């Protein structure tokens, strides 16, 4: 079960660590009653990277079709760190990491340190 207080607490721990430049969390981005990661994360974001969720859903649609609309994958900026929130399935994590996060992470971190 996804607990919003635990999610926000773990994110706050990452933000408090000066060595942390990016936070990646997974799971809880669906639409069931227990899925509350999106709400917890969205309330913390100072800037949203809407393109992440949009492109993630597009790529997911290419792989699995219409169930892609149920994903609430998101990304944004919190206190100068980039945060990615992905669905919990192995395939979704692999897709996000290989196609979006790893190819762009260095550029995002560089932009945030300007």
Task: Place the predicted regions along the sequence by residue.
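Non-catalytic beta/alpha edge segments that cap or flank active sites
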Residues: 1-114
């Amino acid at each position: 079960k996804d607990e919003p207080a635990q999610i926000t607490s773990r994110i706050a721990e990452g933000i408090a660590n000066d060595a942390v430049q990016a936070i990646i969390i997974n799971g809880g981005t669906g639409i069931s009653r227990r899925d509350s990661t999106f709400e917890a994360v969205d309330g913390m974001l100072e800037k949203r990277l809407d393109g992440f969720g949009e492109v993630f859903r597009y790529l997911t649609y290419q792989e699995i079709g219409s169930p892609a609309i149920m994903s609430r994958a998101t990304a944004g900026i919190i206190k100068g760190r980039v945060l990615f929130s992905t669905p919990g399935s192995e395939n979704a994590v692999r897709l996000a990491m290989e196609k979006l996060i790893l190819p762009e992470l260095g550029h995002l971190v560089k932009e945030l340190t300007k």
